[in-house]
Amino acid sequence: MSNPLDRHLEWLNQHTEEIIDAERPIIDPHHHLWPGESQYLLEDLWDDTSSGHNIKHTVFIECTQEFLTSGPDHLKPVGETIFVKKIADEAKKEPSKSQISGIVSHADMTLGEGINEVLDLHFQYGESLFKGIRHAGGWDPHENMRNSHHSPPKDMYLSDVFNQSLKILGEKDLVFEAWQYHHQINQVAEIADRNEDLTITVSYTHLTLPTI
């Protein structure tokens, strides 16, 4: 069975862009790793990072892969950290190639104080690579629009329990990665105002609404 990503590669390969400033060291701050049918793993990543630019390091961003299949639901996202850490360790065998130097994992930010247990396990298995949490908040009221992959409720970012979790991230010097639709960007600004000591990265500033 062919990889479904092949059709995307065919499209990309129609045009080759000029390499600009090829010697400048770059950190790629956002990529995924996909096992299974739509496979995109270390060798695929290296094919991209070695295509002309000087990409020294990358940061993996959660994509709900390889969750634990047993145990409490709130701890299952730790499986993705375990999965990526193994690949990052494998990459160290080829130090001349791009290294996965950060992992932004998932945890349910509506856990409040309960998030500490999840973060502790991410630290345990991700070690120094574990850098933060993404909990996607993309929500729209229209029935024919698809909400983001964590199935958030309306105004999740503004809830008291979510902001309790944000404060815990800040105390642990972890990053929060926000993922929202264009009409929710003011909510990101509001949580930034509430959490001045927290580093927030924004996955998408004006993400368009996907239809079902």
Regions found by a protein language model. Give the residues of each.
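Conserved small/polar residues in nucleotide/adenosyl-binding loops
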Residues: 205-211
